From Swiss-Prot:
Further remarks about this protein from its record: The influenza A genome consist of 8 RNA segments. Genetic variation of hemagglutinin and/or neuraminidase genes results in the emergence of new influenza strains. The mechanism of variation can be the result of point mutations or the result of genetic reassortment between segments of two different strains.
GO BP terms: carbohydrate metabolic process; viral budding from plasma membrane
Name the record gives this protein: Neuraminidase
Region (Disordered): 324-350
Encoding gene per record: NA
Binding site for Ca(2+): D293, G297, D324
Region (Involved in apical transport and lipid raft association): 11-33
Biological classification of the source: Viruses, Riboviria, Orthornavirae, Negarnaviricota, Polyploviricotina
List of residues binding substrate: R118, R152, E276, E277, R292, R371
Self-association state and partner proteins as the record states: Homotetramer.
Glycan-modified residues: N61, N69, N70, N86, N146, N200, N234, N402
EC numbers on record: 3.2.1.18
Amino acid sequence: MNPNQKIITIGSVSLTIATVCFLMQIAILVTTVTLHFKQYECDSPASNQVMPCEPIIIERNITEIVYLNNTTIDKEKCPKVVEYRNWSKPQCQITGFAPFSKDNSIRLSAGGDIWVTREPYVSCDHGKCYQFALGQGTTLDNKHSNDTIHDRIPHRTLLMNELGVPFHLGTRQVCIAWSSSSCHDGKAWLHVCITGDDKNATASFIYDGRLVDSIGSWSQNILRTQESECVCINGTCTVVMTDGSASGRADTRILFIEEGKIVHISPLSGSAQHVEECSCYPRYPGVRCICRDNWKGSNRPVVDINMEDYSIDSSYVCSGLVGDTPRNDDRSSNSNCRNPNNERGNQGVKGWAFDNGDDVWMGRTISKDLRSGYETFKVIGGWSTPNSKSQINRQVIVDSDNRSGYSGIFSVEGKSCINRCFYVELIRGRKQETRVWWTSNSIVVFCGTSGTYGTGSWPDGANINFMPI
């Protein structure tokens, strides 16, 4: 082999070795980087259970790879397994209620495009709370807002915003509805939306953004539902619906829905004579509702729903300090737990209460005749003792000189217990305020607290003279 061939051979071998070494270095670098960034490994969940994420410890030739802390690199996260809500935690023990939210919709309408609404309510998923209301298909500063005192028109839609966000022009219209209820089962939202002719309305059941089922009027007399949140336990949601006379016997049915599909319908049973606009809350393993008797009683009906066998019972709140409006004064009002009290029972307003052992927390208008003012208090023995009237922990939410309206309950699951919250509808405009032609509302929201609290009043606050006519 001549000298030139030797040089070429040595060069080729050297180049080959260098290339192999270079490729090995790249492979080592890629492996090191991959192992460094893959800090957590998530096993696929089996049987719908969450599997813990554990650090991977890797040893190579007695060299421990140590993961760096405080890096700016996003770590891989285990996917959360979505489960149905079961509401099995106990009810929070509270001393009263603390301010939570106020949307100031009417005040903002004086200078902005805000929807005309009524029948508001609040409901929460796992992460956030949302406010709902039935819009009138118009903003307030719009001639279409004239005569919006009417409840049922084909332009009404269910509006949904994050709690505290007024219903502006960008608000989502969930469905067509002049009566509604909404709840989250842990996986998706269910909306019950009623619209159509008074004598032949349709209830649409919308789950996870899709229409899944429907039901038509069964008594041809204004099919209607709660105007507050429904309740879901272990994937089954329940909602109370009524069709029939608003001042006489009506046909109330309790529907059970799974992922938007009606799976069972139970008739109302028990001693309640008339049931409308129920405010429902989870009372594991069942659901309990406090409703409106628009026929015979100013004491509120109670509907107990068994979620396992679909059975229903009903009665009345025992408290002699009754919750509906209009009502007798507190000295002459009565309730025997089982029957309507036949005291100014005709007419009424949506309201709420909830049991606390033998006692009952409740809210009502301060006026016994009008939807004015709002107060809350606890009645000792008000859940178990007929005509109990011992009141403690009274709070004024809206002073008696200002208007209120519907009110209802919603539940919020905490780390160790389930808290009860309520909202108050603050109605403005017609019929009482005849300077304007519209009727709309804002809301104020309070939640139960185990702490201390002060005093105040949280009315709508809009100067009617500043408002569009």
